[in-house]
Amino acid sequence: MAVDVPQLVAQAREGRPRAVARLISLVEGASPQLREVMAELAPLTGGAYVIGLTGSPGVGKSTSTSALVSAYRRAGKRVGVLAVDPSSPFSGGALLGDRVRMSEHASDPGVYIRSMATRGHLGGLAWAAPQAIRVLDAAGCDVVLVETVGVGQSEVEIASQADTSVVLLAPGMGDGIQAAKAGILEIGDVYVVNKADRDGADATARELNHMLGLGESRGPGDWRPPIVKTVAARGEGIDEVVEALEKHRAWMEERGVLTERRVRRASHEVETIAVTALRERIGDLHGDRRLGALAERIVAGELDPYAAADQLVADITEA
């Protein structure tokens, strides 16, 4: 049954959590009304500061996210949290662990928490995450925190979806070397060494500082990622993280970097949507005689695969 999208958006703007949940469900489920939802949201976006948090499992991402929510709420900010969880290989459902970890915010009308499954997407972000960020932005969130699954070798996509990327590490986990391997040192705007009350925290911070220095080719006025030590479970160092985040935001706004990042993000989003649409069109051709005819010409040596692909793309774009 079709929903009244303008009314739903108006309710979301009023801060009604059910309306926000319904909009994200429409987005995540690729509803036939997806385009209508996006068109309605477009003029209402651009006000939220999007912060991405990533790091290996066990570094305390969810605890840190919860602590950041508390800090921003103390400052009177409305906060949205998008927790991207691994999909179950059997049910395809998100683990929803963040609901338990962030239960202290459950009754706060100024906080909206949502889980999204990665659905096997190697970048670590759910394919619908960019649209879900737009929903939270349009719903009046001042800050949107996007917490992703562990960094891994290919999970650096958060950098393309956030205004500021926070990389979390912890002592005794070999995170410094792992971060370098995963290319994380290239995407972090702020680095957090959590669980700083453990042995090895200072050494981890020094190692990270050394590695950042090795890869440094910054000029005067360029952003130099700070390293902040925290004990998120006790809220220690969280105010310093917020201070670092706000400094980075101010630096980006002053130099036009924030707009550049958002334009790049929108470009990536358009490209993803276009590629998905083309894949769907190509999938529709599997039973089409044109594809079979091209394949037969390749086998007969009359056509090479690249020329056939060019012909296929031309047919699709002209249709």
Spans of features found by a protein language model:
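Generic secondary-structure signature for well-ordered alpha-helical cores
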Residues: 14, 25-32, 43, 74, ...
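Nucleotide-state-sensitive switch-loop elements of NTP-binding domains
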Residues: 3-51, 56-59, 64-176
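Long, well-ordered amphipathic alpha-helical subdomains in the mid-to-C-terminal portions
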Residues: 229, 240-317
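Flexible active-site lid/hinge loop adjacent to a nucleotide/diphosphate
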Residues: 171-199
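Generic beta-sheet signal
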Residues: 82, 168, 193-194, 230
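Alpha-helical scaffold elements adjacent to nucleotide-binding pockets in ATP/GTP-utilizing enzyme cores
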Residues: 95, 132, 157, 161, ...
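Canonical P-loop GTPase G-domain recognition
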Residues: 190, 196-251
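Short hinge/gating elements
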Residues: 6-9, 116, 191-193, 226-231, ...
